[in-house]
Amino acid sequence: MSTIDDLPPLRDVIKRHALSARKSLGQNFLLDLNLTARIARAAGPLEDATVIEIGPGPGGLTRALLAMGAQRVIAIERDARALGALEEISGRYPGRLTIVNADATQFDSRPLLGTTRAKIVANLPYNIATALLIDWLSVEPWPPWYDTMVLMFQREVAERIVARENEEAYGRLAVLSNWRAETKILFDISPAAFVPQPKITSSVVRLVPRDKPETCERRLLEQVAAAAFGQRRKMLRQSLKSLPADPARLTAAAGIEPTQRAETVPISGFAAMARELADIRNRTNRA
């Protein structure tokens, strides 16, 4: 039996450390240890793994990760009130929990990893979740310093991450996410599982980095997607006019029609337009 069962219930931990959730920090604490264990299992085998966790709060997911054998958990927590609760967990798992009191949006965890590839597993604070994901998907060089991400988002955001062309939620976030990773919504979590209860359903998403995403420059891919989806109701021949290239030339290079709209273009099409944009730029620079 894991020593996690010897630790006090999370509700008692929250009360003892006065951990009332703060809206300004995007906090909603997940107290059901069955659910935290399910999230931890979704990351795959944890034995010998190093895990980055963002916003552990009272430590429910932290406990699950350690109980399932994670060799090391690096918990990045901005709220100093939670540090005492995390130190209690550290005492039960000596040498396996590294606690960092920092803002995850400003902290680079890579120096703590050395040459080890990590897993990122987190119930992300809602107010920084998308920004963190974009940062992780934008790292260079690629493949990245992590091999799996299992993350919780608002259901609406999760749908935007995994969407494919011709789906309502398909947009810039889906293009970047699915260009660089295989994405899947694993399961939903009811608002009733959290304290305090949010007004929306949450979803756990797994992202596995692709070793070789379709060849193109990330910044140009994002530039093309931003132009196309910035006027998503318009045809590409109109929405792509903000780019330094003839829209017809870009769509021809991708084998798509200039009368199509952004939501109908697969990621391969966006990558092809990004490559053509790079070729045009390079030829212009040589001229």
UniProtKB/Swiss-Prot annotation:
It comes from the Bacteria. GO terms for molecular function: 16S rRNA (adenine(1518)-N(6)/adenine(1519)-N(6))-dimethyltransferase activity; RNA binding. S-adenosyl-L-methionine binds at N28, L30, G55, E77, D103, N123. Its main location: cytoplasm. It comes from Nitrobacter hamburgensis (strain DSM 10229 / NCIMB 13809 / X14). It is an enzyme of class 2 (transferase). This is Ribosomal RNA small subunit methyltransferase A. Specifically dimethylates two adjacent adenosines (A1518 and A1519) in the loop of a conserved hairpin near the 3'-end of 16S rRNA in the 30S particle. May play a critical role in biogenesis of 30S subunits. It catalyses: adenosine(1518)/adenosine(1519) in 16S rRNA + 4 S-adenosyl-L-methionine = N(6)-dimethyladenosine(1518)/N(6)-dimethyladenosine(1519) in 16S rRNA + 4 S-adenosyl-L-homocysteine + 4 H(+). Transmembrane segments: none annotated. PANTHER family: DIMETHYLADENOSINE TRANSFERASE (PTHR11727), DIMETHYLADENOSINE TRANSFERASE-RELATED (PTHR11727:SF7). Belongs to the class I-like SAM-binding methyltransferase superfamily. rRNA adenine N(6)-methyltransferase family. RsmA subfamily. InterPro entries: KsgA/Erm, rRNA_Ade_diMease-like_C, rRNA_Ade_Mease_Trfase_CS, rRNA_Ade_methylase_Trfase_N, rRNA_adenine_dimethylase, SAM-dependent_MTases_sf.
